[in-house]
């Protein structure tokens, strides 16, 4: 608002993570038309990491990355994912038990559950190309239910993506409200196409 700008475009607004490389920066290859990109996580708005050594490590990395003349897309996104994993281990159980999360989950489950399962399997098998996965490579309701069962080992990784999307949803809502209060509109882009190896 101070620079007289009225529209701020964010690309990619949707998650495009397939390879964890710079090629994921292409905004028109989203893996979900609903999931927000983890690159938008604002750590200043999150709880502090309790482990002092880890907190110091991430602060040093933040300063190093912010001092670069150009954004290092891969390192920034990988650092943000690692930071979110630390916070999930620290805060995740309480967050997922909260009434705010439950309300978010009830509204978003139709896309959040398959997205989170896809992300967990992508990491497990090291590729977004689900046709090459040894299992879960075809839609199967029984397999989906097993991945969503909190008593299974797979659920912990699936729930991490629930946590990340909840955090991003809340932060984006706050950023949107702040921008609107200053007369600025946040603009994404309509994902008319999705990555052929995406969750959707």
Protein language model annotation of sequence segments:
Residues 1-200:
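Acidic/aromatic-lined carbohydrate-recognition and catalytic surfaces
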């Amino acid at each position: 608002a101070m620079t007289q700008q009225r529209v701020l475009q964010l690309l990619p607004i949707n998650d495009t993570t397939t390879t964890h490389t710079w090629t994921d920066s292409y905004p028109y290859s989203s893996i979900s038309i609903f999931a927000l990109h983890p690159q938008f996580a604002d750590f200043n708005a999150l709880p502090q990491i309790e482990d002092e050594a880890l907190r110091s490590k991430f602060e040093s990395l933040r300063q190093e990355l912010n001092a670069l003349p150009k954004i290092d897309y891969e390192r920034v996104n990988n650092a943000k994912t690692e930071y979110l994993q630390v916070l999930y281990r620290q805060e995740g159980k309480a967050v997922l038990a909260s009434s705010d999360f439950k309300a978010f989950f009830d509204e978003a489950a139709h896309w959040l559950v398959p997205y989170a399962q896809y992300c967990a399997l992508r990491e497990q098998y090291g590729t977004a190309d689900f046709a090459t996965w040894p299992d879960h490579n075809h839609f199967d309701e029984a397999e989906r239910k097993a991945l969503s069962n909190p008593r299974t080992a797979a659920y912990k990784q699936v729930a991490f993506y629930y946590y990340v999307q909840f955090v991003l949803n809340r932060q984006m809502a706050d950023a949107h409200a702040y921008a609107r209060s200053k007369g600025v509109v946040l603009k994404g882009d309509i994902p008319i196409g999705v990555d052929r190896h995406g969750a959707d």
